[in-house]
Structure formats: structure tokens, C-alpha cells
């Protein structure tokens, strides 16, 4: 079984010590795990269907690239060069020749396949322990074709969790305030992107100032401060539908919103008659 291990050095000194010993730690001792990410195989009919919908020539290879980049940026894995692979993706997914993967020093192997089923994207993937010569995990996902990048992030999460024992973080998004325009007339828009910088899109038009966006920890909702019609108010935005609404009909200015840990309530501040107050959970 593959696990990523960290070796800790414990220095034991006698109680009666008369000299000061200094230990300088100059580098870690954790080497990235060599892992082979085989391109996901795909039949010709599925390839043509996805190319027509997504304008991608080989969606299986594209998903594999997302997984490979995620693993590499984590710093814990060393994805091996695909040019060194000795086994075709469609064969490796059925039964890897572990001696071939051992030759290129791979300790873990990811294989899989992609199919176009009922207008949906179906992805199957497997994680193999090359050293032990056995399967570690096998999962399948079905979703709309446009979610192909997210499938790559989910696969990475599962692999990361299985090999490190820690929760994955790749299937996450970042909400932020984007700025553009000249220095004297900056325009601020609410924006969102994947954790790897892809799928960036604006959620507001920039007609009003937006500040302090906060993600709901349990759903696809965002709360933020907007100066719509020059009146500072806290808003709630559904990322999936684009529907937004004012949070609470309070007089005066509302600001500094934040979700409760369970995502069911919002706490914020409001100012009325020059008196600053804090709301309770609403």
C-alpha cells in the first residue's frame, strides 16, 4: 500500500547538559511520489460527440491534464512524462502491466475511460498501486459535458485523499473582487474561478461597487456588500441561477456580511442614525 510518509527527527538530550546545541533545518525530507497519469481512453463515437459539443479534440486527454496539473501543484506528487509510458491507455485501464510501469519508476498509476451516454459525460477511473500490483480504488461519475474540468478536480480529490489520508481541495472555487480600468476610474466586479485559475467569470457587471464577498460553506450562495444606487446593502447571490436579493429590509447601511458555520444564517452589521449595531443571525 502506498502512503506518503514524513520522517521526524527526535533529538534526546541528557537532563544535565552544559552546552547549547543548535540544529539548522535546511530542507524537508519528503520526495514527491512518482505517479503516472494515463490519458483517459475514449471510443471514436464518443470522441466525435464531445468534440462537437465542447470543441475539444480529445476530452479524455484534457481531463487527464487537469488531474496531472493538480497533483503537480500540490507539491506531493511527481507526474511522470507520458512519452515514457509503455502501455496504451485503453489496455492499461483493463489490466496494467505493472512491470512496464515499474520500469519508469511509477509507484502509483491512474487510468480510466470516457463515454458519451444519453447526452451525458460518463467518466470511470482507477487508481493502482504499482509496487503491490493491485487496484486501490475505482469510481465513476456522470454529469453534463460542460462539467469536464470539475470531474478532473474531483478525481484529483479522490486520489489525493486515498494516497495522503488528507481531504482534497481541488474541487473548490474562489470568489473575489476583480478590478479593471484606469487608475482614476477603477471598476470592481464580483468574479469567480476554479482554484487553478480556470473557468474565470464575472458575476456582476461593474455598474456599482462591490466588496467583501463570502462563500456559503454548504451551498452555491455568496453574500457581499454592494453600493447599488449608492446605498450600501448586503446582498445574497445564487451562483447557479444568477438570482440575487437584498438581505433584510433594514434602514440605513448594512455591511460586513458572513455566513454561519452551517450556512443557514448570515451575520452582518448595520448603521442607523450614526449608531453602529450588529445584527444577530437572521
Regions found by a protein language model. Give the residues of each.
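Multi-bladed beta-propeller domains
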Residues: 194-209, 237-255, 281-282
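Hydrophobic beta-strand positions that form the internal "hydrophobic ladder"
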Residues: 174, 222-223, 263-267
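Sec-dependent N-terminal signal peptides
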Residues: 4-15
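Residue-level detector of Asp-centered blade-edge/turn motifs that repeat once per structural unit
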Residues: 168-170, 217-218, 261-262
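Amphipathic beta-strand/beta-sheet edge segments enriched in Tyr/Trp
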Residues: 21-22, 91-158
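A flexible loop/linker signature enriched in serine peptidases of the S9 family
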Residues: 167, 179-189, 225-234, 248-253, ...
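Short beta-strand->alpha-helix linker/helix-N-cap micro-motif
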Residues: 26-97, 110
Amino acid at each position: 500500500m502506498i502512503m506518503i510518509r514524513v520522517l521526524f527527527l527526535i533529538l534526546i538530550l541528557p537532563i544535565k547538559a552544559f552546552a547549547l546545541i543548535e540544529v539548522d533545518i535546511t530542507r524537508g525530507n519528503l520526495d514527491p511520489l512518482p505517479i503516472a497519469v494515463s490519458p483517459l481512453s475514449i471510443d471514436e463515437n464518443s470522441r466525435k460527440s464531445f468534440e462537437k459539443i465542447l470543441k475539444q479534440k480529445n476530452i479524455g486527454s484534457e481531463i487527464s491534464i487537469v488531474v496531472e496539473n493538480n497533483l503537480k501543484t500540490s507539491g506531493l506528487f511527481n507526474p511522470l512524462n507520458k512519452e515514457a509510458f509503455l502501455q496504451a491507455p485503453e489496455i492499461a485501464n483493463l489490466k496494467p502491466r505493472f512491470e512496464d510501469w515499474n520500469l519508469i519508476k511509477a509507484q502509483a498509476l491512474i487510468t480510466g475511460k470516457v463515454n458519451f451516454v444519453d447526452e451525458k459525460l460518463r467518466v470511470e477511473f482507477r487508481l493502482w498501486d504499482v509496487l503491490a500490483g493491485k487496484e486501490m480504488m475505482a469510481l465513476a461519475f456522470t454529469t453534463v459535458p460542460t462539467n469536464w474540468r470539475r470531474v478532473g478536480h474531483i478525481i484529483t480529490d479522490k486520489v489525493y485523499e486515498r494516497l495522503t489520508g488528507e481531504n482534497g481541495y481541488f474541487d473548490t472555487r474562489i470568489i473575489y473582487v476583480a478590478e479593471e480600468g484606469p487608475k482614476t476610474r477603477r471598476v470592481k466586479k464580483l468574479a469567480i474561478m476554479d482554484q487553478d485559475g480556470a473557468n474565470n467569470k464575472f458575476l456582476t457587471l461593474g455598474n456599482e461597487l462591490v466588496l467583501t464577498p463570502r462563500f456559503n460553506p454548504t451551498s452555491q450562495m455568496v453574500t457581499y456588500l454592494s453600493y447599488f444606487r449608492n446605498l450600501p446593502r448586503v446582498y445574497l447571490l445564487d451562483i447557479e441561477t444568477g438570482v440575487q436579493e437584498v438581505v433584510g429590509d433594514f434602514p440605513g447601511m448594512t455591511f460586513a456580511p458572513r455566513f454561519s458555520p452551517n450556512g443557514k444564517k448570515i451575520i452582518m452589521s448595520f448603521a442607523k442614525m450614526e449608531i453602529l449595531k450588529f445584527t444577530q443571525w437572521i
